[in-house]
């Protein structure tokens, strides 16, 4: 019997062929902090033989990574910024995947009384009137953009606030930790709050205003702008993210019996 002896180069080729394909996906810190990635990524690997490398940043930075061609796709939650990204030719299309909502967290004693507010604008007005400590992410993330728009809708200018308003320039988890340490108010996405372990004396005080709706969307980077991006893999991932299996995993992801996201992709 003849034995096949492989040279070093051939061995490397075979070894590379056995490895899963890889792509880079920029995701928000709120998505990462929710823990959902730990559920989805192993199933993506199993079904597609695809390793998805996450770059965890705020929405603003994720969009800049996409504009630079440093990632193959983005998963973010700021529709206005996403539409500008598409209008600039940086993405091929926007596909809504899932949603949750933003919530206002604060000290259990609720000195500003926001638990009884009629809407988000009133809750923020009461925090401002009380001069109660408030932590802002201050990082150009989707959550930060939404927070600023809510202050503006309430007729308030965050840039003019006093020392009670603290912009920390950090992700959702770090900002929640700061709020916990300061016993301060903060706006969070519901998923990050539910998965947050250092709640201390904080509690969910206000939710339910329709303006707090929080949509996540997936956008592949345009290969006509950046020929090196792995557009084929990005499209494979998109089709998986809108599949029945992804829907079941997303809708079934719960903490203490409470769902963190609702799948709403149109197929």
PLM-predicted stretches and their roles:
Residues 73-99:
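Acidic, polar ligand-binding/catalytic clefts
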Residues 21-51, 55, 60, 64-70, ...:
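Exported/periplasmic ABC-transporter solute-binding proteins
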Residues 1-4:
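Positively charged n-region of N-terminal signal peptides that target proteins for export
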Residues 69, 100-101:
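Short, conserved active-site loops that position catalytic residues or coordinate cofactors/metal ions
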Residues 104:
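Serine endopeptidase catalytic core focused on the charge-relay Asp
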Residues 16-20:
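Sec/Tat signal peptide C-region and signal peptidase I cleavage site
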Residues 7-15:
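Bacterial N-terminal signal peptides
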